[in-house]
């Protein structure tokens, strides 16, 4: 059935077509699209299109003139009737039509005592300088100002500045819930809020921060209900003025034309001098229910759900589907203001569409900002406690509890847990018209993303589908046909999961394979995919799901999925589950023809046999395990890699068509971090039906296992593929340990410490120097020639520095092995995680770190110990080792006391209570009593170990399988933050619906403090390496995940480099900055070139705006060039480019909207590049899109020349490592974003920039050179038996992990040239020359082993590895041998 839309769509015919049918416009997402020729448009609509395509780059170009209502021309002046001018500013446009109707009716009354001129502004329009000037001009002769829901700080300050100038002159100023700065403008006779926020203000408590943060609006509503009755009988003018303010709020919240008429009459006759004593009668406010149930066809609003259901059951207009007692029931959450103002057409459309599709609806509304009560009151049966509904869809866009300013997520989560159904939060456009959104590559306005996408996600909200647009002429919301249909179909599909039996449900499990190769099937970050799938399916089988034919082992499962059983000889193909002929593909895939621009006619040559499109995978009963096709770069890699836009290929589209329409999955489970679906081209957030992720996922509920430590990309999956993201644990981190020569070095140092004062001291030092050189440590520690006579203090210093280096290696944290879903770590495996949790001070919780407590015991500060160890002071290195060992021992003793004889943690709470407070019986005290730290502060230890006990429970909890089953059963999955569990243990337990954070909450104060330490160390290190000079420019990278985990540390680093500090508003949101004085800064302002990842751009575009404003502000400061390198370079570049200083100061870059990565990594992984210049051109073409704070709605604009000139001034490149789980060679993203060699080519002097990595993975933050970090990575992972043997335990997938580290090392050679030759030599000795290891690798995963051999040969061929011809000949022979072996396997 076609969509039912209740109100006419008052926009151009061409745009109606675009919204009403599958839109053949994927290409518009990254191109300049013009209006349809001849389409009739009003002036405002045309302006909107011009803005979106080529205008001044603001988000909206609607003008207040469409909201200006004046008395009939000449009429008022002829009759001598006074004119009253009212100016209003609101967040959303729903009041526009109601106010307009009210004013027109007032002015049409022949007996009126006044003529009303009323003009309204949407707060977002005030960004435009011309509109702001008009606003100020309107205020200059206004009698009354009204403001409501003004919560965007920079715009709130503009409103405050303009109104403040006219406040004393105006007759009345009324501001309803807004930021305190604006609320203080209130003035009604003697009533004022000028003291708001001060303790003596009666309204102070309403703004006071409290945990129940939905309370402000609800407190206001209680006042609205009760105060007028009380104040009416108080004689003072103050009381009556306060009463009229509250009545005004009643009228405003009532919102109907009648209420607004009476509101304007009341204010005019009470406060406009020309109307004092006039015969103007007004009625009391018509009060609507604060909360209730509303249906457009119902005779009334209902306050009783049983009454509503009785009416619903007696309706005669329903279709047969609705009469089915088993029909799905959808709860809708609506904004009361839209209903009372009559701006409800978009709500009607959703209700009608759901009912047309056979779903019953219970549409509830509330007038405040707390919907938790109404959801319980109207959606849950009070007798049984069971929900009436199978799914809930919020159409408000806001968090469930709290509006734009503050939220109470725990309260919302508690309410949603009681409902226990899927929770979808759909969006009406607020700050853009429909055409502006359609033409925007960004999609949703960034402030709407922050308020109405990011915040509902913290409640567990998902599927941010834009279902309603806004008419620029009337301001009314209207349904978007295809979007409403998509929303309703998907809501019903989620509801069906609640109703279907387990046996009949069909599940499509999707695994990934990149780079495309049999050895890579089942790629996912730190997850053993096939073992996990096997574990999940066994559990689902026990639960009653049909998994017929599941093999007996995980290994057999791998074989059945990855090998083409029909192939007689060696075949690169996987098992073919379905052959789709071209006619079937085209008939079932509505957008198939759009892919031909990039891929030609179907079937093409990817996932194809030349006649049919091939779907790879294997079906077991009602479960299909499929392999997601790759991006398609392997088909014609260089053409596509250079493309700023792309599209899925026919095979990719066919896969999802098969899953949805042929296999008919009830849900798809994307297994592991991460695939390609969510990164396909389209709007960043708030997609249209012309966006590929939306087209591909279709109507299938999407469940997605995502690594807990990667909330940023999980958020992209949530927003762009409508995923319910369930977190999984990465393997517990362990200390790297020592091996081979490093272990020997440790033993020599131990001997030196006990024998240094004997005659053997010099001899042992000589051995230490010799062994250190054999271990290639001379690259990291300056070592003298062997046999040189050294005085004792110099001997100590050399030994101390070598000791510090091997301690750094030994204590380096690394995840060993791969995680399996449903297998939480054992207690002993959790010890290392607890040790690291215990290593951080947590001042907000008054918890001291264990190293800090132990250092204080011997009269030291742990920071001083770290500094001494870093300098190689032997005594401090030894003390740090003792502290580290004592910490591990104390925590191990504690964990052992909570563990049963099977190694499982049991009943931590009770066992902890029996330990605490009993002095020497506390296991950590018992352990420390055997060390030099026997006098450690017992109370601090007790506080710490109480906290560690709670963490231990979370670490070993297993919710991953349980949450998957909840999602499959159509239940609510509890949300939780993603990130680093060491920094934030609230990430645990895993199995939560992973979310990021409020993007306006960063950087935090703690992040600023950490950032300052790192930047200061970076600049000092660069001065040492650069002849005492500060770097003038630093080129750096901002990652989405890093900034979530660290609450904005790297963002804060940029701000500190240029010398500005963020300023939080009343609600703690960071939306502006101020310069730090040069005196306070104590150094020059460093210029920056900021490369934001595509994911950072999607999640933190408000912070990109903040950064760009900050850089431009600094460039415009009147300061000496030698103290302000931003200004110095911007002036030079302005002259060279012939542009303004402000434009030349562009420094914030990323990909084009909807595009991700430089694709250098993909070229390296596929070995599909010829020379480094090609990689550098690729980087520049993909990453040279600039953000402009002066045109924030324009999206990312290509400014390659500006990007090149800025990079050419870089003296250093810089990146951050923030957690132990992911380092430089673990993923390809780091080298993909590294511009080191590129900068060298752009610099006029041809000098290579210094390259640094900040390591904040431990409490002792370090700044190392890139080459030092690559060496450390190689020693602790690739060359470390503890790491590679841990990987080998994971079998097939472990071999792939080893190969991936070598490939990423080659990537660093390509982009930076910072990999030492010995790294390749040692890797070759470890994996190729060792016959037993070579055989294990080849037998376990021959495809990945072939890639390993190929990578060694490539490293040599490209000049990154100099080795013997004998080694190369061996590798060539091995390549032929493994090719034969692969052919033998497939034969």
UniProtKB/Swiss-Prot annotation:
Name the CDD domains on file.
Answer: CobN_like
Please tell me whether the keyword Ligase is annotated for this protein: yes
Gene Ontology cellular-component terms listed: chloroplast membrane; chloroplast stroma
Per its UniProt record, what InterPro entries does this chain match? BchH (IPR011771), CobN/Mg_chltase (IPR003672), Mg_chelatase_H_N (IPR022571)
Cystine bridges: which residues?
A: none
Q: What is its EC number?
A: 6.6.1.1
Supply one GO BP term. Answer: chlorophyll biosynthetic process
Which keywords has UniProt assigned to this entry? ATP-binding, Chlorophyll biosynthesis, Chloroplast, Ligase, Membrane, Nucleotide-binding, Photosynthesis, Plastid, Transit peptide
Q: Which positions form the organelle transit peptide?
A: 1-50
Q: Name one Pfam family in it.
A: CobN-Mg_chel
**What pathway does the UniProt record associate with this protein?**
Porphyrin-containing compound metabolism; chlorophyll biosynthesis
Which catalysed reactions does the entry list for this protein?
protoporphyrin IX + Mg(2+) + ATP + H2O = Mg-protoporphyrin IX + ADP + phosphate + 3 H(+)
Primary residence: plastid
Q: Where in the cell is it found?
A: Plastid, Chloroplast stroma; Plastid, Chloroplast membrane
One Gene Ontology term of the molecular function aspect: ATP binding
Topology with respect to the bilayer: Peripheral membrane protein
Subunit (UniProt): The magnesium chelatase complex is a heterotrimer consisting of subunits CHLI, CHLD and CHLH.
Q: Which family does it belong to?
A: Belongs to the Mg-chelatase subunit H family.
User: What NCBIfam families does this protein's entry cite?
Assistant: BchH, PRK12493.1
Q: What does this protein do?
A: Involved in chlorophyll biosynthesis. Catalyzes the insertion of magnesium ion into protoporphyrin IX to yield Mg-protoporphyrin IX. The reaction takes place in two steps, with an ATP-dependent activation followed by an ATP-dependent chelation step. May be involved in the plastid-to-nucleus retrograde signaling.
List the protein's name: Magnesium-chelatase subunit ChlH, chloroplastic
Organism name? Oryza sativa subsp. indica
